[in-house]
Amino acid sequence: MQMNATRGYRPGLVDLASGQVSREIFVNDDIYAQEQERVFARSWLFIGHESQIPNPGDFFASRMGEESVILCRDRAGAVHVFLNSCRHRGMKVCRYDDGNTTVFTCPYHGWSYGTDGALVGVPFFREAYHSELDRTKYRLVEVAQLCCYKGTVWANWDASAPPFLEHLGEFRRFLDLILDGWDGREGQAELLGGVQKWIIPCNWKFPAENFSGDTYHNISHRSVDLVGAGPSGRSRRDYGELNVARKLHVAIPDRGHQTITYMLPKDHQPQAAYQNSPEVAEYFRHCEEERRRRPGANSRLIGAPGEIFPNVALLPRQPRTLAVWHPVSAHQTEVWRFFFVDRDAPRPVKNFLRDYYIRYSGPAGMTEQDDMENWNYAHSASRGVIARRHPYTYEMGMGHAVENYEWEGLRMPGRVVDLTKAQ
């Protein structure tokens, strides 16, 4: 795609042969504007979780790119996602984060919509509209496609886009590491608490790229490792288990998804963790044993940071989260982080994990604040005229990816780079 050269945008932004990527992609306002039309208006985006709307009339205000949307359950129990904008003059019809209602009423002129999107009330319908307004033409704008997968809700404005599971492809197994139970049972995850939200001064692609498989920034979190802020009380991560695994970068190029994952050997036995809390340690010991008894490739995988194109980050390990990088402008991103836990986990386990998630994540979290500082200063340092002349380098692993990677009988999809020696 090309743009007016006077607007500061040049062709040749990505050189696949040399691994050079122009900084313009991360700081250019015109590119950002095109992304809203060509990426966010056509992609599958994460909306929320069905546990946020368990009852008829429940709603949750979410986002799709720059658009405000409403996730709600109608009186018949069906799930909908609507554009949060009145068809009359465009005012938001819902200004609360969540709740329960029978109708969404626009505070501007009073048009009212049912939880199924139908226009059910128009002030002065007889007196001013002479009963001639066709209310069926002015339903709330609804997404073209909707998919509920293991409790998560995804939506797409593009009716011609492939179905969600086709969009996921073989990357589905990595999302399952979050949504399935720690013991391997399908779809056992539930949201823990509310949604953590904050704004960071950088382009949305900085965090998205970071979670797409950047394995080279552990130095940023060195201080956290020294503190021993991990769930076991010994380090930020349980390195003992990771040290016996194969560390892999997995990319599904035709869909844009990427992740880091760890592949355990066949004969691996669960290692002790959460030693400072015997009840929590016993729960996860039992779950690990059950998981390895169940058939399926995921019993040998340890999840790590990943990204579902375009803007949903995975973190299947503790903290077990999905994060959404909502674009606000070319230079600002709103982060929404959703935390997960097994729905039938004992209350002490949920409380323990809640405390750890808060300690780890968000603008006050001991780890994530390091990431935010990196993204903030990388963005601001890339906006100048001189800085834009010098591309970023993405040469790590170039020429060393393999298709159909296999180790001890377990195959990985997509293009895989073995990073075991780089741990």
Features from the language model and the residues they span:
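Short, contiguous pre-domain boundary segments
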Residues: 8-23
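Non-catalytic accessory segments flanking enzyme active sites
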Residues: 19-70
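Short clusters of hydrophobic/aromatic residues that line enzyme substrate/ligand-binding pockets
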Residues: 47, 93, 119, 313, ...
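C-terminal catalytic domain of Rieske-type non-heme iron oxygenases
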Residues: 144-423
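Generic structural signal for secondary-structure transition and capping sites
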Residues: 40-44, 91, 216
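Rieske [2Fe-2S] iron-sulfur-binding domain
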Residues: 52-159, 163-173
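Short Pro/Gly-enriched beta-strand edge/turn motifs at strand-loop
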Residues: 42-54, 124-130, 303-309
